[in-house]
Amino acid sequence: MTPATPSGQASTVPAGRAAIRVRKLTKAFGHQAALRGVDLEVAEGEFLTLFGPNGAGKTTLIRIIASLARPSSGTVHICGQDLSKEATAVRRQIGLISHNPLLYGDLTADENLHFFARLYDLPDAAARIDAILEQVGLTSRRRDPVRTYSRGMVQRLTIARAVLHDPAIMLLDEPYTGLDLQAADMLRGVLQELAASNRTVILTTHNLEQGLEMCNRAAILNRGRIGWQGQRSEVDLDSMKEVYRDVTGRP
Protein backbone atom coordinates (compact mmCIF):
# COMPACT_ATOMS: atom_id res chain seq x y z
CA MET A 1 0.00 0.00 0.00
CA THR A 2 1.12 3.55 -0.69
CA PRO A 3 0.91 6.09 2.15
CA ALA A 4 -1.77 8.69 1.51
CA THR A 5 0.00 11.85 2.53
CA PRO A 6 3.64 12.71 1.81
CA SER A 7 5.79 13.88 4.69
CA GLY A 8 5.09 17.42 5.81
CA GLN A 9 1.71 17.84 4.09
CA ALA A 10 -1.61 18.19 5.87
CA SER A 11 -4.13 15.38 5.59
CA THR A 12 -7.75 16.09 4.76
CA VAL A 13 -9.91 15.82 7.85
CA PRO A 14 -13.17 13.85 7.34
CA ALA A 15 -16.35 15.86 6.85
CA GLY A 16 -17.90 17.25 10.02
CA ARG A 17 -17.00 19.77 12.66
CA ALA A 18 -13.47 19.64 14.02
CA ALA A 19 -13.53 18.48 17.64
CA ILE A 20 -9.88 19.50 18.03
CA ARG A 21 -8.17 22.20 15.99
CA VAL A 22 -4.52 23.05 16.67
CA ARG A 23 -2.90 25.91 14.79
CA LYS A 24 0.78 26.94 14.67
CA LEU A 25 1.36 25.52 18.15
CA THR A 26 4.79 25.97 19.72
CA LYS A 27 6.15 25.11 23.14
CA ALA A 28 9.63 25.77 24.47
CA PHE A 29 11.21 24.79 27.76
CA GLY A 30 13.95 27.36 28.16
CA HIS A 31 15.97 27.18 24.95
CA GLN A 32 14.64 23.71 24.11
CA ALA A 33 11.78 23.62 21.58
CA ALA A 34 9.32 20.78 22.24
CA LEU A 35 6.73 21.78 19.61
CA ARG A 36 7.59 23.68 16.44
CA GLY A 37 4.47 25.01 14.73
CA VAL A 38 2.11 22.02 14.98
CA ASP A 39 -1.05 22.12 12.84
CA LEU A 40 -3.54 19.32 13.53
CA GLU A 41 -7.27 18.74 13.19
CA VAL A 42 -9.31 15.85 14.54
CA ALA A 43 -12.93 15.55 13.43
CA GLU A 44 -15.81 14.70 15.75
CA GLY A 45 -15.97 10.94 16.23
CA GLU A 46 -12.53 10.35 14.71
CA PHE A 47 -9.92 8.04 16.25
CA LEU A 48 -6.44 9.43 15.55
CA THR A 49 -3.24 7.66 16.55
CA LEU A 50 -0.26 9.97 16.94
CA PHE A 51 2.99 8.09 16.53
CA GLY A 52 6.43 9.34 17.43
CA PRO A 53 9.63 8.37 19.22
CA ASN A 54 10.41 9.37 22.79
CA GLY A 55 11.06 13.10 22.93
CA ALA A 56 9.01 13.86 19.82
CA GLY A 57 6.63 16.14 21.74
CA LYS A 58 3.61 13.82 22.03
CA THR A 59 3.09 14.26 25.77
CA THR A 60 3.60 18.02 25.53
CA LEU A 61 0.94 18.26 22.81
CA ILE A 62 -1.53 16.12 24.79
CA ARG A 63 -0.98 18.18 27.95
CA ILE A 64 -1.67 21.40 26.06
CA ILE A 65 -4.85 20.02 24.47
CA ALA A 66 -5.96 18.83 27.93
CA SER A 67 -5.35 22.33 29.34
CA LEU A 68 -2.64 21.08 31.70
CA ALA A 69 0.07 23.19 30.06
CA ARG A 70 0.15 26.44 28.14
CA PRO A 71 1.68 26.78 24.68
CA SER A 72 4.38 29.33 23.95
CA SER A 73 2.35 30.43 20.93
CA GLY A 74 -0.45 29.21 18.69
CA THR A 75 -4.07 28.29 19.34
CA VAL A 76 -6.17 25.30 20.37
CA HIS A 77 -9.93 25.09 19.83
CA ILE A 78 -11.99 22.26 21.34
CA CYS A 79 -15.44 21.86 19.76
CA GLY A 80 -15.19 25.47 18.63
CA GLN A 81 -14.18 26.80 22.06
CA ASP A 82 -10.91 28.72 22.43
CA LEU A 83 -8.87 26.84 25.01
CA SER A 84 -7.10 30.00 26.17
CA LYS A 85 -10.44 31.63 27.06
CA GLU A 86 -12.71 28.73 28.05
CA ALA A 87 -10.42 26.22 29.72
CA THR A 88 -12.90 25.22 32.44
CA ALA A 89 -15.66 24.42 29.96
CA VAL A 90 -13.21 22.56 27.74
CA ARG A 91 -11.93 20.35 30.57
CA ARG A 92 -15.44 18.99 31.10
CA GLN A 93 -15.38 17.60 27.56
CA ILE A 94 -12.06 15.77 27.92
CA GLY A 95 -11.00 12.52 29.55
CA LEU A 96 -7.26 11.96 29.96
CA ILE A 97 -5.21 8.82 30.51
CA SER A 98 -1.52 9.63 30.90
CA HIS A 99 1.73 8.68 32.63
CA ASN A 100 0.64 10.86 35.55
CA PRO A 101 -2.47 9.13 36.95
CA LEU A 102 -3.92 12.35 38.46
CA LEU A 103 -5.07 10.41 41.52
CA TYR A 104 -4.65 10.98 45.26
CA GLY A 105 -2.60 8.17 46.76
CA ASP A 106 -3.85 8.55 50.32
CA LEU A 107 -7.50 8.40 49.22
CA THR A 108 -9.40 5.24 48.34
CA ALA A 109 -10.74 4.53 44.86
CA ASP A 110 -14.20 5.49 46.13
CA GLU A 111 -12.95 8.78 47.55
CA ASN A 112 -10.99 9.64 44.41
CA LEU A 113 -13.95 9.05 42.11
CA HIS A 114 -16.40 10.89 44.38
CA PHE A 115 -13.99 13.84 44.45
CA PHE A 116 -13.93 14.03 40.64
CA ALA A 117 -17.70 13.45 40.48
CA ARG A 118 -18.17 16.57 42.61
CA LEU A 119 -15.85 18.54 40.32
CA TYR A 120 -18.02 17.58 37.35
CA ASP A 121 -21.28 17.96 39.32
CA LEU A 122 -22.40 14.51 38.18
CA PRO A 123 -25.96 13.38 38.88
CA ASP A 124 -26.38 9.86 40.31
CA ALA A 125 -22.65 9.77 41.06
CA ALA A 126 -22.83 6.81 43.45
CA ALA A 127 -24.51 4.53 40.90
CA ARG A 128 -22.13 5.68 38.17
CA ILE A 129 -19.10 4.98 40.37
CA ASP A 130 -20.43 1.53 41.33
CA ALA A 131 -20.82 0.61 37.66
CA ILE A 132 -17.41 1.91 36.61
CA LEU A 133 -15.54 0.21 39.46
CA GLU A 134 -17.25 -3.05 38.49
CA GLN A 135 -16.25 -2.50 34.86
CA VAL A 136 -12.57 -1.99 35.69
CA GLY A 137 -12.49 -4.81 38.23
CA LEU A 138 -11.77 -2.76 41.35
CA THR A 139 -14.95 -3.26 43.37
CA SER A 140 -13.20 -5.44 45.95
CA ARG A 141 -10.43 -2.84 46.43
CA ARG A 142 -12.57 0.28 46.32
CA ARG A 143 -11.97 1.15 49.99
CA ASP A 144 -8.20 0.63 49.93
CA PRO A 145 -5.82 3.61 49.59
CA VAL A 146 -4.58 4.01 46.03
CA ARG A 147 -0.96 4.02 47.26
CA THR A 148 -1.40 0.28 48.01
CA TYR A 149 -2.34 -0.50 44.39
CA SER A 150 -0.15 -2.17 41.78
CA ARG A 151 0.80 -0.22 38.64
CA GLY A 152 -1.88 -2.04 36.67
CA MET A 153 -4.55 -1.29 39.28
CA VAL A 154 -3.61 2.39 39.29
CA GLN A 155 -4.00 2.45 35.51
CA ARG A 156 -7.40 0.78 35.78
CA LEU A 157 -8.51 3.44 38.26
CA THR A 158 -7.08 6.10 35.94
CA ILE A 159 -9.33 4.75 33.18
CA ALA A 160 -12.30 4.88 35.57
CA ARG A 161 -11.52 8.51 36.41
CA ALA A 162 -11.10 9.42 32.74
CA VAL A 163 -14.49 8.06 31.64
CA LEU A 164 -16.41 8.99 34.82
CA HIS A 165 -18.00 12.13 33.34
CA ASP A 166 -18.67 10.52 29.93
CA PRO A 167 -16.43 12.93 27.99
CA ALA A 168 -16.83 13.61 24.28
CA ILE A 169 -13.05 13.57 23.77
CA MET A 170 -10.54 11.02 25.08
CA LEU A 171 -6.80 11.66 25.15
CA LEU A 172 -4.62 8.60 25.80
CA ASP A 173 -0.90 9.26 26.17
CA GLU A 174 1.12 6.01 25.87
CA PRO A 175 -1.58 4.19 27.87
CA TYR A 176 -0.03 0.71 27.58
CA THR A 177 3.22 1.73 29.29
CA GLY A 178 3.94 -0.40 32.37
CA LEU A 179 0.65 -2.33 32.31
CA ASP A 180 0.29 -5.92 33.44
CA LEU A 181 -1.52 -8.33 31.09
CA GLN A 182 -4.88 -7.97 32.83
CA ALA A 183 -4.77 -4.18 32.70
CA ALA A 184 -3.58 -4.21 29.07
CA ASP A 185 -6.44 -6.50 28.04
CA MET A 186 -8.94 -4.30 29.87
CA LEU A 187 -7.50 -1.18 28.23
CA ARG A 188 -7.79 -2.81 24.81
CA GLY A 189 -11.47 -3.43 25.53
CA VAL A 190 -11.92 0.22 26.51
CA LEU A 191 -10.25 1.31 23.27
CA GLN A 192 -12.52 -0.98 21.27
CA GLU A 193 -15.55 0.61 22.94
CA LEU A 194 -14.19 4.08 22.20
CA ALA A 195 -13.55 3.15 18.57
CA ALA A 196 -17.16 1.96 18.25
CA SER A 197 -18.59 5.01 20.00
CA ASN A 198 -19.06 8.56 18.79
CA ARG A 199 -16.21 9.90 20.91
CA THR A 200 -13.21 11.69 19.50
CA VAL A 201 -9.96 9.94 20.44
CA ILE A 202 -6.27 10.77 20.26
CA LEU A 203 -3.97 7.90 21.19
CA THR A 204 -0.21 8.47 21.37
CA THR A 205 2.26 5.62 21.09
CA HIS A 206 5.53 4.56 19.51
CA ASN A 207 4.17 1.02 19.00
CA LEU A 208 2.97 0.86 15.38
CA GLU A 209 1.05 -2.40 15.70
CA GLN A 210 -0.93 -1.28 18.77
CA GLY A 211 -1.52 2.17 17.33
CA LEU A 212 -2.92 0.97 14.01
CA GLU A 213 -5.27 -1.57 15.58
CA MET A 214 -8.30 0.69 16.02
CA CYS A 215 -7.61 4.14 14.56
CA ASN A 216 -9.13 5.54 11.36
CA ARG A 217 -6.36 8.10 10.85
CA ALA A 218 -2.71 8.29 11.84
CA ALA A 219 -0.04 10.96 12.11
CA ILE A 220 3.65 11.04 12.98
CA LEU A 221 5.15 13.67 15.26
CA ASN A 222 8.92 14.01 15.11
CA ARG A 223 11.10 16.66 16.73
CA GLY A 224 8.08 18.79 17.49
CA ARG A 225 6.60 18.76 13.98
CA ILE A 226 3.91 16.74 12.22
CA GLY A 227 5.91 14.88 9.59
CA TRP A 228 3.12 12.79 8.06
CA GLN A 229 -0.64 12.23 8.19
CA GLY A 230 -2.78 9.66 6.42
CA GLN A 231 -5.95 7.58 6.51
CA ARG A 232 -5.69 4.19 8.20
CA SER A 233 -7.38 2.53 5.23
CA GLU A 234 -4.48 3.57 3.00
CA VAL A 235 -1.63 2.07 5.03
CA ASP A 236 -0.84 -1.36 6.39
CA LEU A 237 1.72 -2.23 9.06
CA ASP A 238 4.57 -2.74 6.59
CA SER A 239 4.02 0.54 4.75
CA MET A 240 3.58 2.34 8.08
CA LYS A 241 6.94 1.00 9.23
CA GLU A 242 8.49 2.39 6.06
CA VAL A 243 6.89 5.82 6.52
CA TYR A 244 7.86 5.92 10.19
CA ARG A 245 11.46 5.11 9.33
CA ASP A 246 11.53 7.78 6.60
CA VAL A 247 10.08 10.47 8.89
CA THR A 248 11.91 9.70 12.13
CA GLY A 249 15.05 7.96 10.95
CA ARG A 250 14.25 5.14 13.37
CA PRO A 251 12.95 1.60 12.87
Model-derived features with residue positions:
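Helix-to-loop junction immediately C-terminal to a conserved catalytic motif
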Residues: 66
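The feature captures the beta-strand-to-loop junction immediately N-terminal to the Walker
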Residues: 51-53
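Conserved ABC ATPase "signature" region
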Residues: 114, 118-141
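Conserved ABC transporter NBD signature motif
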Residues: 74-82, 90, 228-230
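Catalytic Walker B motif of ABC-type/P-loop ATPase nucleotide-binding domains
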Residues: 170-173
